[in-house]
Regions:
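Compositionally biased alpha-helical segments
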Residues: 20-71
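Sec/Tat signal peptide C-region and signal peptidase I cleavage site
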Residues: 15-19
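Sec-dependent N-terminal signal peptides
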Residues: 4-13
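A composition-driven surface/loop motif
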Residues: 70-409
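Basic side chains
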Residues: 2-3, 319
Length: 409
């Protein structure tokens, strides 16, 4: 009874206060309400408290605090990671839409189907045994602000809702994600949906089970200030379904045992730009040494309109760029296109897993299955190794402009 009276007194005070914040503590989750928009405070037989559509069991409430701090930003869930002491703060206007669980430094949230506006999930802090999981039915924003997260058992960050995910790297921030070895996860940072990456921050990725980063739909790097560093991966650096597009920023990939950037087709052949890579600007640097590895690999077309691409690739059967469809290298107005490749290796011989027959993959600077059009830009290439070649084209070659330098010729 004393507890209930305390709750009633606190809520009454909050309702009367202007420019104050009411915080409801349940475990390591804080629900933040601005007093001026709180509205009615309802008790249900003293066993439940309802605030802005969110119902709390009074037995689950640890405390209610009213202070003059600023309320959480609207439509926001904040996660402050701290080894063994991670806290979640959620704004009251979306609390009723989110099912949140905190277990140690592992945080999961599932948004209900009633969610009809975008929610921002803001992550920061450090945890050496933590993770973030999100599922839902509506597009969302994921913001990293000096986040350092390692999950020894699975993905560090897994977004599972299948919608557009706006990934923002806070300006000036450095963020690092690492997963554990021997898990079942597809990537250290996985998005089931399509990702648009922005912000003048840095994201470091280490994939100890499979890929460093993966998405089941397109990934688009949109901002010139964005820097993504793949430090290592058991398989691909970036593994993207549908298409990968880069308009600016910096992408550095090294230490992978698979391809640096791999764009694969989805199951629906009607999906926009399926299996394509589109580079309109920015800088990509790739340094990888492995058997039959590729720097850039597009299952279908690859289009380069601008930007700088530098690839140092070595290993039998390796390729600086592998194009399953057509390749266009152009230089858009106001842009500069520069491709520098150093590729070394001999022929990789193997048994085809489908036919069971012997097969081989030759070392190439650029391998094009379809047609190749060069209309602008500069390509510099050094290729070494027995039977290695600079550019191999199965289809037609059309020259409209630009420069190609291959050593040896």
């Amino acid at each position: 009874m004393k507890r209930i009276f305390t709750l009633i007194a606190a809520t009454a005070l909050t309702s009367a206060a202007v420019a104050q914040t009411m915080k409801v503590y349940t475990g390591h989750v804080v629900t933040s309400y601005a007093a001026e928009v709180l509205g009615d405070v309802n008790f249900n037989n003293g066993t439940q408290l309802t605030l802005q559509g969110k119902t709390f069991n009074t037995s689950d409430i640890d405390s209610i605090v009213v202070d003059r701090s600023q309320a959480a930003a609207a439509r926001t869930m904040q996660v402050a990671y701290a080894n063994g002491n991670t806290w979640v703060t959620v704004s009251g206007d979306v609390a009723s839409l989110l099912n949140i669980a905190v277990k140690g430094d592992h945080v999961s949230v599932v948004a209900t189907p009633e969610t009809a506006e975008e929610i921002t999930y803001a992550l920061g802090g450090t945890a050496t045994n933590g993770s973030f999981y999100m599922d839902g039915h509506y597009k969302s924003t994921l913001r990293f602000d000096n986040l350092n997260l390692t999950n020894p058992d699975s993905a560090a960050v897994c977004i599972d809702n299948g919608k557009r995910i706006n990934v923002i790297l806070a300006d000036g921030s450095t963020n690092s994600l690492t997963d554990g070895a021997g898990g079942m996860q597809k990537a250290c940072f996985f998005i089931n949906g399509h990702a648009e990456i922005k912000g003048a921050g840095v994201l470091n990725l280490t994939g100890n089970t499979k890929h460093a980063y993966a998405s089941d739909e397109y990934t688009w790097i949109k901002n010139g200030g964005t820097t993504i560093n793949v430090l290592s991966a058991v398989s691909d650096g970036l593994h993207v379904d549908q298409y990968f597009q880069m308009d600016g920023g910096t992408l550095n990939v090294s230490g992978t045992k698979g391809d640096c950037v791999d764009a694969s087709c989805t199951k629906d052949p009607a999906d926009l730009q399926n299996g394509q890579i589109i580079i309109n600007g920015g800088a990509i640097t790739m340094d990888v040494a492995a058997i039959d590895v590729k720097g850039l690999k597009g299952e279908k077309d690859v289009t380069i309109n601008g930007g700088t691409i530098k690839a140092t690739v070595s290993g039998d059967g390796s390729k600086g760029m592998s194009v399953g469809g057509n390749l266009l290298v152009a230089q858009a107005e106001g842009a500069t296109t520069l491709i520098n490749m150093t590729v070394s290796g001999t022929t990789y011989k193997y048994t085809d897993p489908i036919t069971g027959l012997p097969d081989s993959s030759k070392c190439r600077g650029i391998k094009v299955t379809g047609n190749y059009t060069l209309s602008g830009g500069t390509i510099n290439m050094t290729v070494t190794g027995k039977k290695a070649k600079g550019i191999s084209i199965d289809g037609e070659y059309k020259y409209l402009g630009g420069t190609t330098n291959v050593v040896p010729e």
